[in-house]
């Protein structure tokens, strides 16, 4: 009976996993068996999401992705890959985390990583930019993204802004923008042009760079109080007004512009997902490719009930939000489930909860010695971010083996049921050793 229940439960889980998108959503299910035929050998441009069913951010993306497929129907094809079911494609295209969105444009062998806002509108804009690029390539034209006399343009990387399209492209978009107001005769503008173009190329998919000829569009320049050239304004992510524009105060080399804009982009990224380590895949998703990985080991559910555990998890999420600019990975496991991990990081032996911060590239880690509280962890992570604190080599100098376990169901633990013993077969009158 228990075996039958397990089979039914497995069938339910598998059914739930495959229910992310249905044929009626317009999202094509892609697998290793049909990917080449559907995507690589097709002339159409594709937007492809690589996801894992257990990933919270993937689940949050579902309604926007369905909306995207509906909006792009007949223009751009939209597909999805369940990377948890088969890692072949995610490995082939270097997918390190979920969800990962790639746009397969004219050069199918070199898809573009999409790193912008996870909204249907923002993703659609990126996809349509690929359509425009492909059309211009076929026609042999450079397109209309030139920034005039400033020479700031390089293909589609620097976007030409005018009085007619400024509000629509900049203010009404969710993207981060840097806008250069220039004059064609300005020497400093001409010097900035190649640096601006180079920065735009490096920041593609993260921050949009535009250029507006202030001599041709004087009313727009006046609206933003432009008094000299070049003037660079920063427009934050999300819905914005003209009053939200800020002065750019960085340097004028490509590296300066990229560094300044990247800091703004990182500040706008969502908080990292706190991932439960239930198998090798979840462990890699949480920690692979991250500068550091914050690994917490929480008490067994019988020692710390659902309310207790959720309190710990809320603390970790709060701190993940605070340190999100570091782009660290965040993971947790129940004490005793991943013994090899605990042994390699020397945690758990002195009790739970415990924490270690790991640099898997250097195979070094540091253990939280203070209180597992918001203040205690904050102080520990602050020291780590400043390069302070004691570090030790990961035992064995290799990543620990991760075993597959069931994910926590969010409920209190249940003590194992004791089986009733039939005393009728036991002769209580005999003394036996």
From Swiss-Prot:
Underlying gene: CaBP1
Protein name, as recorded: Protein disulfide-isomerase A6 homolog
Catalytic center residues: 55 (nucleophile), 58 (nucleophile), 186 (nucleophile), 189 (nucleophile)
Catalytic activity: Catalyzes the rearrangement of -S-S- bonds in proteins
Signal peptide: 1-19
Subcellular location: Endoplasmic reticulum lumen; Cell surface
Annotated glycan sites: 279
Region (Disordered): 405-433
Keywords noted in UniProt: Disulfide bond, Endoplasmic reticulum, Glycoprotein, Isomerase, Phagocytosis, Redox-active center, Repeat, Signal
One GO CC annotation: cell surface
UniProt motif (Prevents secretion from ER) ranges: 430-433
Any one GO MF annotation of this record: protein-disulfide reductase activity
PANTHER family in the record: PROTEIN DISULFIDE-ISOMERASE A6
Highest taxon above the source species: Eukaryota
Gene Ontology biological-process annotations: phagocytosis; positive regulation of apoptotic cell clearance; response to endoplasmic reticulum stress
Taxonomy of the source species: Eukaryota, Metazoa, Ecdysozoa, Arthropoda, Hexapoda
Organism the protein comes from: Drosophila melanogaster
Gene3D superfamilies noted in UniProt: Glutaredoxin
Observed effect of gene inactivation: Reduced levels of phagocytosis. Loss of both CaBP1 and Prtp does not cause a further decrease in the reduced level of phagocytosis seen in either CaBP1-lacking or Prtp-lacking embryos.
Skewed-composition ranges (Acidic residues): 417-433
